[in-house]
Amino acid sequence: MRVVIQRVKASRVEVDGEVIGTIGRGLNLLVGISRTDTIAEVEWMVRKCLDLRLFPDEKGSLALSVQEMGAELLVVSQFTLYGDGRKGRRPSFDRAAGGEQAQTLYDRFVAGLRQSGLRVETGQFGAMMEVFILNDGPVTLLLEREAPLEQEDNRDD
């Protein structure tokens, strides 16, 4: 599972010109699901997204999590995070999960975030979307958690 986390001042997602999700200060999460991902990867990623200290304290240090800030989350599915462009000119998406598996795990990810009590908005799974992001910082991280079969390194919690 891969998530691109961007700290934002505001973000919104549109489908066919209609706003379907919008947030103020918070995190924009672009979510990719691999074909080997399980609930274990989803649960780990939920905890990480909620607990990472990506917001500044009064001294300017990254010391506060999205939960501590009471900030908002905009979650957008993005299978292209599993695009592999190493061969040829067209990326391969062989490692991306199929639609049904990806949607099930994506829905579990969103549900896990909502259990925090924070406001969580989403894009439309599988749709062509326009995502508007007003980055703050910018602060952008790529989190990755692979299922044990694809594991190359030791897992860090």
From Swiss-Prot:
GO terms for cellular component: cytoplasm. Keywords: Cytoplasm, Hydrolase, RNA-binding, tRNA-binding. Homodimer. A motif (Gly-cisPro motif, important for rejection of L-amino acids) lies at residues 137-138. It is found in: Cytoplasm. It is an enzyme of class 3 (hydrolase). An aminoacyl-tRNA editing enzyme that deacylates mischarged D-aminoacyl-tRNAs. Also deacylates mischarged glycyl-tRNA(Ala), protecting cells against glycine mischarging by AlaRS. Acts via tRNA-based rather than protein-based catalysis; rejects L-amino acids rather than detecting D-amino acids in the active site. By recycling D-aminoacyl-tRNA to D-amino acids and free tRNA molecules, this enzyme counteracts the toxicity associated with the formation of D-aminoacyl-tRNA entities in vivo and helps enforce protein L-homochirality. It catalyses: glycyl-tRNA(Ala) + H2O = tRNA(Ala) + glycine + H(+); a D-aminoacyl-tRNA + H2O = a tRNA + a D-alpha-amino acid + H(+). Belongs to the DTD family. Its EC number is 3.1.1.96. This is D-aminoacyl-tRNA deacylase. Gene3D superfamilies: D-tyrosyl-tRNA(Tyr) deacylase (3.50.80.10). One of its GO terms (molecular function) is Gly-tRNA(Ala) deacylase activity.
